[in-house]
């Protein structure tokens, strides 16, 4: 029988699975619910594998074999992956998520560590590992099959359209990245330094994210994010050159920074020609606002302005990115049309 600590870990995993199922019931979108259920299934398998070790002697080797079979299935699915569609934007969004789920199975370098102190926990972790691969493969197939079932019989491939657009956008991103000005080394303003570092790091990695994408659909999404990041950097540079300090002294200044971020996100949703293309980027911007809100909520009483740097960076970065979204989406659509 497992000792108290191990029994607690198995119980906690089962409880975690139950909690994630409940969260899935009230998730704001089906994709969020799907991710919650993936988490729930992995936690449930962790607990089940641990108890199976006790009840019937489930071995690590059996789970390794099961994982190898799943990877083999994933390779077969990957070799048959066809980018059928009638609209490259919609196709890229669905296939992109399927690509990422599939890539998580095929390119997962994590392997559960063999615990000499507890073979039971090793088996439990392998159960989690196996189930994570299984549900991601199943969900990739589900999204793929569900989307293709909506297509007309004469739907053609959008693979070339996506790949050509990605190459055009990659060249654009490379050109823009080369044009990034050198970051100043004599600015001792911590707020400006943090903001510049946050925006610049995203801009500099823009091409890498496209190159590392598991397929053309994800690459298009990464190119859209990259363009947004580079345009946001341009906006930041312009504001810094105009003498903007981004500093705050009063609660009203903080409120104005937050309002600007929320308004920018709302405006981007209205102004972007294909909202679905940029919604993930704007969702990230909204999360930045939420993170800043949580940080502010933790303060109590009088607060020194320097302690507001983190939320102000979050609000300002969200504003810069959201305001850059419409132009980025226009550039992506132009690339798809050529």
What are these regions (language model features)?
Residues 1-338:
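Extracellular/lumenal glycan-associated context and N-glycosylation machinery
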